[in-house]
Regions:
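Beta-propeller-forming repeat regions
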Residues: 1-340
Length: 340
């Protein structure tokens, strides 16, 4: 539901700072008007946040609080001096040709232009470290995005994104300029996509999305053909896993793919300690139980734990956020280059 009234609040260290005390003209106030059916669902109440070194690594980082990405987009950079919050800048994109309607369900922070300061990549647009618009591709909102040195043969960083609007599909772009390096087209909403270094036989990252079942290298070359993947998928018999004990209902479907012609496309993960990414995959509804996939160059194989069991068999683990199968926390807690 749309929040009709709520005094905006920001949090300092251990103390709440009310709007009007030090925020003043900071984050935009709630209202019943947002544009693009702002009160439909929660489109006017989409929030993102990040921490960025807007003045470089020699200075303290800033918090970047964001509202809106389907239409209007506001980004508020704020510093904390130990006593109060101070606005660094407020970016407002309220018309086309800007970051308006360009955001994603997450943002990416990184120095995309090589000036030593972080920029905010906001879906199909990028905001400079001073709060100005760096560029906008105009390709619109998307559900997934990845920023990094995806192509080691090119200078700087690249950005991979999928798009919700027909026919944009997915694309890899120069993170500094917005130049499209390669793209795939789709006939519908491309709701999933992933960039991960899963194949040591190809330089850089591999990318794939739900618009078509192909795995591409960082140059855009197809390394797994769509038709082959579909043939394998259509002829594959589903592998069924025995129902869980304890909280699991024996009538619930807990199947997962022991072997899949296409890698999962929700989350990458460092899992087994080698130099490649593994994949955090998920089984069927209603719990979408998590398990680990390993790409062997031809197909994705379910990777058991050291005791021979799958991840979801340990502690009856489930995921959240429906088909996105989001973990509550994924992080390297022990510093061993493996993520828990």
């Amino acid at each position: 539901h749309t929040i009709w009234y709520n005094p905006n609040r920001a949090f300092g260290v251990g103390r709440q700072v009310a709007e009007g005390e030090s925020l003043k003209d900071g984050f935009p106030a709630y209202s019943s008007v947002w544009g693009d059916k702002g009160n439909y669902g929660n489109r006017g109440e989409r929030y993102l946040a990040g921490v960025a070194f807007l003045d470089g690594k020699d200075h303290l980082p800033s918090a970047v609080m964001c509202r809106g990405y389907y239409t209007r987009s506001y980004l508020w950079a704020v510093d904390f001096d130990g006593k109060q919050l101070k606005t660094k800048w407020l970016h407002a994109s309220t018309t086309s040709g800007t970051a308006y309607a360009q955001g994603a369900h997450s943002l990416a922070v990184g120095d995309v232009d090589g000036d030593g300061c972080d920029e905010i990549t906001y879906g199909s647009a990028a905001i400079n470290n001073d709060g100005t618009l760096l560029y906008s591709t105009g390709l619109g909102h998307g559900d997934a995005q990845h920023l990094g040195d995806l192509d080691p043969d090119r200078p700087g960083l690249e950005y991979f994104m999928v798009h919700e609007e027909y026919p944009y599909g997915s694309d890899l772009r120069d993170a500094k300029t917005g130049e499209i390096l390669y793209r795939t087209l789709d006939r519908d909403d491309t709701g999933r996509g992933l960039a991960a270094d899963i194949d040591a036989n190809h330089r850089g990252y591999e990318m794939w999305s739900s618009d078509n079942p192909e795995v591409r290298d960082c140059k855009g070359n197809v390394i797994v053909e769509a038709k082959d993947a579909w043939k394998k998928r259509s002829g594959e018999k589903k592998k069924k896993q025995a129902p869980q004990q304890g909280d699991w209902n024996s009538n619930e479907k807990t199947t997962f793919r022991a072997v899949s012609p296409m890698p999962a496309m929700n989350f990458r993960i460092y899992w087994d300690g080698d130099l490649q990414d593994e994949l955090l995959a998920n089984g069927r509804a209603p719990h979408f139980p998590p398990y680990i996939q390993k790409w062997n160059g031809k197909e994705a194989v379910a990777l058991p734990l050291s005791n021979g069991k799958q991840l979801f068999e340990m502690g009856h683990s489930v995921s959240c956020n429906w088909t996105k199968a989001t973990p509550n926390l994924q992080a390297d807690l022990f510093g061993d280059w493996r993520e828990e």
